[in-house]
């Protein structure tokens, strides 16, 4: 069974973490390569305009696989250098692949998002939570540190003070608190989660694919660039956008008072 599955619904892709018997825990050998391959395939498909990331079963992701951490022969054994290598070629490959998706990503958080699972949700651009979802970064309770980039992601999502509170206490928060803290955009009844995510993805997917990808790139660059650098990148992306048929279609649709039909040209 592959750790991730992809379902294509026209311009929308649903990426499902697929280890429900272990609450979609990650860290087995090969997980990084499987997620990277799935994300590379989506990036190469210009017909995909939006991705929904969710979990199979009752959890989004419980994070790292505790049973494998306890296994003396497992991937987290062998001392410092082998463990460092495992993180870089496996856990970090998962993180880099999801963070590097070119199109907008919606995390549909259907249950527990703990540790790495919470950080995976933060890699999405938009997060919608089921009212059954819960969030936490419990690394310290295992004698660990956030090893997947969470110390970079979470403060940028909810601010340094809230992130520090979650990291230093190991507390879990419910979906309502996550919404109050800005970790998720909205909370919806559990049974409507995927319908809500698909509705939002449909809105996004109706927009020009090139402009969507360029805008996501600008948002990502804006997290680390100066304002002058952001302006320079924006002018380049805008020059590309002005040359597209989709730009002309958007202008004409507005002048003609009709809905635009963007074809990715």
Could you describe each region identified by the protein language model?
Residues 22, 55-97, 113, 143, ...:
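Glycine- (often His-adjacent) and acidic-residue-rich active-site loop
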Residues 25-28, 62, 71, 141, ...:
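Phosphate-coordinating loops and pocket residues in cytosolic domains that bind phosphorylated ligands
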Residues 1-56:
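Conserved CoA-thioester-binding segment of acyl-CoA-metabolizing enzymes
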Residues 41, 96-210, 243-244, 249-252, ...:
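Crotonase-fold acyl-CoA enzyme core
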């Amino acid at each position: 069974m592959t750790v991730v599955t992809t379902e294509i619904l026209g311009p929308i892709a649903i990426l499902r973490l697929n280890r429900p018997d272990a609450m979609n825990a990650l860290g087995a050998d090969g997980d990084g390569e499987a997620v990277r391959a799935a994300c590379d395939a989506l990036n190469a498909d210009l017909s995909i305009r939006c991705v929904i990331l969710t979990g199979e079963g009752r959890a989004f992701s419980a994070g790292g696989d505790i049973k494998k951490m306890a296994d003396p022969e497992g991937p987290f054994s062998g001392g410092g250098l082998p463990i460092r290598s495992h993180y870089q070629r496996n856990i970090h490959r998962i993180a880099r692949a999801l963070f590097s998706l070119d199109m907008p990503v919606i995390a549909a958080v259907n249950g527990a998002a703990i540790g790495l699972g919470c950080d995976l949700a933060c890699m999405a651009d938009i997060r919608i939570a089921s009212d059954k979802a819960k969030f936490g970064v419990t690394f310290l309770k295992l004698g660990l540190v956030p090893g997947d980039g969470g110390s970079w992601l979470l403060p940028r999502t909810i601010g340094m003070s809230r992130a520090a509170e979650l990291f230093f206490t190991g507390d879990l928060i419910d979906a309502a608190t996550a919404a109050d803290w800005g970790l998720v955009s909205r909370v919806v009844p559990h049974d409507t989660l995927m319908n809500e995510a698909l509705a939002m993805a449909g809105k996004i997917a109706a927009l020009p694919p090139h402009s969507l990808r360029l805008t996501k790139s600008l948002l990502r660059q804006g997290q680390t660039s100066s304002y002058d650098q952001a302006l320079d990148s924006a002018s380049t992306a805008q020059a590309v956008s002005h040359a597209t048929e989709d730009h002309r279609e958007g202008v004409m649709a507005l002048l003609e008072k009709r809905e635009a039909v963007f074809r990715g040209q």
